[in-house]
Regions:
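Lipid interaction determinants
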Residues: 1-163
Length: 163
């Protein structure tokens, strides 16, 4: 499958049905114990936006003064002694960020892979890179499976088309 006409099979909004990670030895795990949700949006201008997150992440402080002080402490101060409230904010923000992945950028396909060219991302090291995912469609183009091997692990994400 290649060419512009097949790109249209990707277009639309997809919700995450399952995300698993398998080791070479067959051991299979589910990130965040399967407590995940996500959306993948393929736009007809050949752009993709992906968001995956752990459900039930901690609510975060919206106290801008407190957060500004905390940012200053982390970036400017040598003495990182912080109040209990700031420690809780740091923990909550770490857990919230650790349980969240997002990126966007243009995409293209070849016969077996979709290439996501990352322009923005929660993970700074992804910006300017290309994520390559093997793809397959099933159920009359209502299900999209993406997989990628990395070292001894293979991530497999099953997406269902939003109705």
């Amino acid at each position: 499958m290649s060419g512009k006409e097949s790109l249209s099979n990707f277009y639309g909004i997809w919700h995450l049905s399952e995300w698993s990670v398998a080791k070479i030895d067959g051991d299979k795990k589910f990130p965040y114990y399967g407590n995940v949700m996500g959306y993948l949006i393929y736009h007809p201008d050949d752009w993709v936006s992906a968001t995956l997150m752990e459900k039930n992440r901690p609510e975060l402080s919206e106290n801008r003064v407190q957060l500004s002080k905390l940012r200053k402490k982390i970036t400017d101060d040598i003495d990182l002694s912080v109040s209990t409230e700031m420690q809780q904010d740091m923990q909550d923000y770490f857990l919230a960020a650790h349980g969240y992945i997002s990126y966007t950028g243009p995409f293209e396909i070849d016969d077996v892979n979709v290439h996501h060219h990352i322009r923005t991302s929660l993970l700074p090291q992804w910006i300017g890179t290309t994520l390559i995912r093997n793809y397959s469609f099933s159920n009359d183009y209502q299900q999209l499976t993406l997989s990628a091997a990395q070292g001894d692990y293979t991530d497999k994400l099953i997406w269902k088309r939003e109705q």
